[in-house]
Amino acid sequence: TVKNTGSVSGKDIVELYYTAPYTKGGIEKSSVNLAGFVKTKELEPNESEELQVTFKLEDMASYDAKVNKAYVLEAGDYGISLRADAHNVIATETITVDNTIVYDENNKRSTDEEVATNKLDFAAGSFESLSRKDHFANYDAATAAPVNFSMPEEIKAVYENNSNYDPEKYNNDEDVMPVTGAKNHVMLEDVRGLDYDDPEWDLLMDELTVKEMNSLIARAGYQTTEIKSINKVRTVEADGPVAITNNFTEESTIGFPTEVTLSNTWNRELAYRFGQSMGKMADEMNISGWYGPAMNMHRAAFGGRNFEYYSEDPFIAGVMASDTVNGALEYGVYPMLKHFAFNDQEANSGWQLCTWVDEQTAREIYLKPFEMCVKNGKYCALMAANCQLGYMPAQACAPLLKDILRNEWGFRGWVITDWYSSKWYQDADRMIRNGADGMLASYDSDTNNVSDTTSATGVLAMRQASKDILYTVVNSRAYEPENLNPSMQNWVKGVIATDILILLL
């Protein structure tokens, strides 16, 4: 219960935290973690409000990247506290976990489709991670500037870019060429609302030609292309995180305060209303996809995109972004969450900026906001980041885009690249084979068109990418009946209804 004991009206925030047991040399843990929050209504002097904040036991699990290679809820006492902020405790209780719980293949977390296990070992690098052991005894070593900037020989041996990437090297002889150009008479609107794995989708995908799929993949910048054979309408997508601008018409909307300003309110209802406003404006402009919200971390105060991102705290970012996403989805506009992932530096971000990160840090901090949004919002899309994850481009990183995003989190939607400028690593073949679906280009370049259109592996990748795009589009505002048939105005519908009624009489 929150009571206003002051002399003027106001709001307050109920913040719930947990403190997990820490073993020196064991799994690294923060001393205190935000588990939930809610903001009061406007309370008059002496007015009270009763609020409830809940979370699951598994939400207190930490990721053990070294031993179990899974999320682990260690046995011990967990302090649950209401606080004014991360430091000032108002009230506390203790929960005791009698036995360690490992969320492995026999006991995955309730929100996972597949068990979470190490997928990013290749990106761990050789840096020293900061540890709580002995009161951060390794602080100087962990925060010291690097002295060696050379790429190890074993990484050079597997490093690829447009100069040495050959899609045929990765062809699978066991792949079977899919059907293309079939006449099954299934239109895209026929699969609206159907499950991603419904057999009707196979009949639809069999109808696409290689040329149609390539057009959908290669020219996905600010649009998805028309495919007349399946009655696929052209859709428009637009930037950016706090305003809508149509790149084709230059029509734009009002701009809202930055997402970090929104986060500082701790107001979930306001985040939802912000999403509604973005969705409504996009809908009124006939825009179906929104290049936002952006939810990378404020890793440093001078991050080049900090104005687009919510917070330095992954939980706050995930909660506020999820509410924003669900607000936009109310208008049938699919948010394109960006920049997935680890995009916290603008300088050289598209030119071989290699980000090295251990699995625990990746999952508990940098991936968490995206995970929360994907699991809480249906029919989303994502924009992959320009940076490298280890030695792999994030836009062509199967462990990230397939293993974690789709297999573990259960994402069903499409992934677009960041701005496509024929950089040294941007190659459509490589990207669609590793989990991306559309190239953010509105013109033809050397590498945004798929080159391997004759192998079974190549065409299967095109089919998968096309399905991901179509699944998102058909479940959006673009395929609402009034948008699909805009010529049928309300007065026409009224006349038809009247005629039917007269016939029935």
What are these regions (language model features)?
Residues 1-64, 71-87, 109-505:
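Glycoside hydrolase catalytic-domain context in secreted enzymes
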Residues 88-110:
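Short beta-strand elements
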